[in-house]
Amino acid sequence: MAPVGSRESLAAAIQAGADSIYFGIENLNMRARSANTFTIDDLREIARTCDEHGMKSYLTVNTIIYDKDIPLMHTIVDAAKEAGISAVIAADVAVMNYARQIGQEVHLSTQLNISNAEALKFYAQFADVVVLARELNLEQVAEIYRQIQEEHICGPSGEQIRIEMFCHGALCMAVSGKCYLSLHEMNHSANRGACMQVCRRSYTVRDKETDVELDIDNEYIMSPKDLKTIHFMNKMLDAGVRVFKIEGRARGPEYVRTVVECYKEAIKAYLEGTFTDEKIAAWDERLKTVFNRGFWDGYYLGQRLGEWTRNYGSAATERKIYVGKGIKYFSNIGVSEFLVEAAEVSVGDKLLITGPTTGALFMTCLLYTSDAADDLIGV
């Protein structure tokens, strides 16, 4: 499941062959501040685009819902139903209940922190797909999957519940993303989609009694590394995970395309019996080229304490530099015209071209000539 926070990322998800995408509109989603691109008027277009490419479309309505939000929530869920959105992703029972009332499919968010089969049985009345708590290890996931099969725990469709888990991307320092630090420090609630990323800053630790600053080995003491599971995708599949969710609605289209392609290839390799160390190493190198804060395994393999990044921002092995913008595309000959206005281009440079219909295209500069009258780049 690919994260989509812009039309460029939607096009990139299509290019990468994603089976589904998830996105938010305006308010009432957990990326309302950082990925606020789409509106309620875009729902039909997004649903139609996904249908044309054989993808499912999932709309996040996963914030805390207050009484004053109920009319807006009804409007959004009604619009999703009318537009043909595949499902809404919910964390509040008010959203789940209303969606079921009008016949809109529901998926359950990790914000619910579902950690056992008994809780799953309760929520099964609302949804066929459930994101389990991200703090679970794979043994715990496998136990829940075993009970789903043995006790035939089904959702509204009558089919057995499918387990969805995050496989890649940023992790919140708080349990299942329920963070109050941003609200406390900046008066912007992460649980209302307005996280100010306070945890990503560097900090000093000082003893209040002695005023002595403690010597710590990492000043980014609340900023987790990014999750990466591609090297043990086989174990996740064996544990019963059936939907793999990639975090990153606020990240660029090149991130979406690269990460989706790598994980799709990994799942295919597992199914074909060609999931090898050599392929894992190649996927790792590709994943390092796009935005990341360093990587760790999350809690899936039994680790109980998080691993913290040592960088502010991205630790990607490749750095993007804005060079110029597209001017015109000549569709009859497949040639694009670009205005190079911000940086020089050299033969051998890796070029990234993005756009609402372009998605993310990676090319290499094979020819570059420049004179007073004209610049010509060949790729």
How should each PLM-predicted stretch be described?
Residues 1-20:
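N-terminal basic/disordered segments at the start of proteins
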Residues 5, 331, 337-344, 356:
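A structural micro-motif recognizing beta-strand termini
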Residues 9, 39-100, 105-110:
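Active-site beta->alpha loop and helix N-cap motifs at the rims of alpha/beta catalytic domains
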Residues 13, 92, 123, 165, ...:
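Conserved, mostly hydrophobic/aromatic
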Residues 22-41, 61-67, 250-254:
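Glycine-rich, proline-tolerant flexible connector loops at the mouths of alpha/beta enzymes
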Residues 107-242, 256-259:
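Catalytic alpha/beta core domains of metabolic enzymes, predominantly
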Residues 140-143, 249-321:
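Anionic-ligand-binding alpha/beta catalytic cores of soluble enzymes and soluble regulatory domains
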Residues 368-375:
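Conserved small/polar residues in nucleotide/adenosyl-binding loops
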